[in-house]
């Protein structure tokens, strides 16, 4: 197998990080909605932690995207 094929396989595998970020954010917000349905008074406390957690998960997805772009155009 030549190096170009291996490069595109690596790009495809790095896109799985973006998929994981999407699933992580969906899990965070579905858990938040489930918690708010059980205890609506906790919205103020829960909202801050949810946004921080979603930001961290999205950052990992952004890193996977940047890695894929670096592999595609630089390597």
Curated annotation (Swiss-Prot):
The keyword Transmembrane applies. The record marks 58 as: Reversibly protonated during proton transport. It holds the Pfam family ATP-synt_C. GO terms for cellular component: plasma membrane; proton-transporting ATP synthase complex; proton-transporting two-sector ATPase complex, proton-transporting domain. CDD domains: ATP-synt_Fo_c_ATP5G3. Signal peptide: none annotated. Keywords: ATP synthesis, Cell membrane, CF(0), Hydrogen ion transport, Ion transport, Lipid-binding, Membrane, Transmembrane, Transmembrane helix, Transport. The chain crosses the membrane at residues 8-28, 54-74. One of its GO terms (molecular function) is proton-transporting ATP synthase activity, rotational mechanism. SUPFAM superfamilies: F1F0 ATP synthase subunit C. It is a multi-pass membrane protein. HAMAP family: ATP_synth_c_bact. F(1)F(0) ATP synthase produces ATP from ADP in the presence of a proton or sodium gradient. F-type ATPases consist of two structural domains, F(1) containing the extramembraneous catalytic core and F(0) containing the membrane proton channel, linked together by a central stalk and a peripheral stalk. During catalysis, ATP synthesis in the catalytic domain of F(1) is coupled via a rotary mechanism of the central stalk subunits to proton translocation. This is ATP synthase subunit c.
């Amino acid at each position: 197998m030549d190096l170009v094929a291996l490069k595109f396989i690596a790009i495809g595998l790095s896109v799985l990080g973006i998929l994981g970020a999407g699933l992580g954010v969906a899990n965070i917000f579905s858990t938040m909605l489930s918690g708010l349905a059980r205890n609506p008074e906790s919205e103020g406390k829960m909202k801050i932690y949810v946004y921080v957690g979603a930001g961290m998960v999205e950052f990992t997805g952004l890193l996977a995207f940047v890695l894929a772009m670096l592999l595609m155009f630089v390597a």
